[in-house]
């Protein structure tokens, strides 16, 4: 069944057909701009108007019409070239009758090319005086209304291409995201790390505690998982002698969607041979401080009306932070029964596979996590919840592991990596026991990883850091789906015409 066109769409289709009648391709041909709008603005924005007029600077630009005004034999329009806009002056006497008629029939959203000279208007706005007006692409749908269209965030997430056209904040977020990725890559490259790629399809579930997506490999006739972490393949590379490696890529976890979770998300994992948790803590701090300095020129910035200060990273053990909030000291040798009793008293839900370590983690989640606003390294996680981390020598119930918390959320996870293959096998067996008790996030036994460890992995420090949350933090964005170009949304496969899609910019086709 054909989609019913709105009144505005019908008019645009008619204009498309009119272009065809005069042998103009509504969807254009190759057009080579001499400048981007950004380049023109950077070079000539501050130029003297008289000098500009005398210089007769010729430019050739392309962009989308986002504003159009004027009647009679002359008019103005604003061209948008991604994140930059510029005014153009179109006059019948300069472009000719045929081109001027095409200009008059253009709609907001159409893509055009203009050739002409730069000048400044009486209000000192840098403008292109058009000598040629070239139609490049007909937009058959109108742009959303500035107010209603931008209020419906879910609709914009589903139609990110429209969001990018009309929402400057969205464009700025993704420009900043690109910069963040660039700076992080540069940081690790400059530290001597080697960027690598490891498989997205993995035969064994491991490297994190999470529910996986499962798919079937027809050629091999076996099930594979979309990776939930890159940890184990990267540590195999450490075994192979790549002493400094990192990978930036997507992970997949078949879990819930909320303001800080998306099933498909980006991380960096980095591994450094002959290092430990403290070295990785220092590396993480240095990376984030350099990142803030490059973006803001300082170590302080605002997130959701909270002042965040990267000049100082606090450090506290998990059990000490719980004691501070609850008075309970989990360094005491509590039995499982005592821990269960404490959990019941504090209304903490306990699953069948829970041990003392899981209960400690649950206390931390309930009483501490949301209070950690400024950057805080929380270290000393229980052994039972850290199957890939080395035991702490002073207290083997805990591990040499830390998580970084900012604004009440986890941003990074790091260990002194367990490199004892015999102990690692015991940990994997414990994970299998947890899985039998209902922990569907427990790791599988990865025999190939154990085989690699048997060849000898040097003492190693490892880091995993979520990049989407980091972009949220550094762009002051409240929802993770607003820092991912194409996030998962409900009913994404169903094409529906939202009411806002038919509300167009004021005087869209009459300006």
Swiss-Prot record:
<dbReference type="InterPro" id="IPR044136">
    <property type="entry name" value="Lys-tRNA-ligase_II_N"/>
</dbReference>
<dbReference type="InterPro" id="IPR004365">
    <property type="entry name" value="NA-bd_OB_tRNA"/>
</dbReference>
<dbReference type="GO" id="GO:0005524">
    <property type="term" value="F:ATP binding"/>
</dbReference>
<keyword id="KW-0030">Aminoacyl-tRNA synthetase</keyword>
<dbReference type="InterPro" id="IPR018149">
    <property type="entry name" value="Lys-tRNA-synth_II_C"/>
</dbReference>
<dbReference type="InterPro" id="IPR045864">
    <property type="entry name" value="aa-tRNA-synth_II/BPL/LPL"/>
</dbReference>
<keyword id="KW-0547">Nucleotide-binding</keyword>
<keyword id="KW-0436">Ligase</keyword>
<dbReference type="GO" id="GO:0005829">
    <property type="term" value="C:cytosol"/>
</dbReference>
<feature type="binding site">
    <location>
        <position position="410"/>
    </location>
    <ligand>
        <name>Mg(2+) 1</name>
    </ligand>
</feature>
<dbReference type="InterPro" id="IPR012340">
    <property type="entry name" value="NA-bd_OB-fold"/>
</dbReference>
<keyword id="KW-0648">Protein biosynthesis</keyword>
<comment type="similarity">
    <text>Belongs to the class-II aminoacyl-tRNA synthetase family.</text>
</comment>
<dbReference type="InterPro" id="IPR002313">
    <property type="entry name" value="Lys-tRNA-ligase_II"/>
</dbReference>
<keyword id="KW-0479">Metal-binding</keyword>
<dbReference type="Pfam" id="PF00152">
    <property type="entry name" value="tRNA-synt_2"/>
</dbReference>
<keyword id="KW-0460">Magnesium</keyword>
<comment type="subunit">
    <text>Homodimer.</text>
</comment>
<dbReference type="Pfam" id="PF01336">
    <property type="entry name" value="tRNA_anti-codon"/>
</dbReference>
<keyword id="KW-0963">Cytoplasm</keyword>
<keyword id="KW-0067">ATP-binding</keyword>
<feature type="binding site">
    <location>
        <position position="410"/>
    </location>
    <ligand>
        <name>Mg(2+) 2</name>
    </ligand>
</feature>
<dbReference type="GO" id="GO:0000049">
    <property type="term" value="F:tRNA binding"/>
</dbReference>
<dbReference type="InterPro" id="IPR004364">
    <property type="entry name" value="Aa-tRNA-synt_II"/>
</dbReference>
<dbReference type="GO" id="GO:0006430">
    <property type="term" value="P:lysyl-tRNA aminoacylation"/>
</dbReference>
<feature type="binding site">
    <location>
        <position position="403"/>
    </location>
    <ligand>
        <name>Mg(2+) 1</name>
    </ligand>
</feature>
<dbReference type="InterPro" id="IPR006195">
    <property type="entry name" value="aa-tRNA-synth_II"/>
</dbReference>
<dbReference type="GO" id="GO:0000287">
    <property type="term" value="F:magnesium ion binding"/>
</dbReference>
<dbReference type="GO" id="GO:0004824">
    <property type="term" value="F:lysine-tRNA ligase activity"/>
</dbReference>
<protein>
    <recommendedName>
        <fullName>Lysine--tRNA ligase</fullName>
        <ecNumber>6.1.1.6</ecNumber>
    </recommendedName>
</protein>
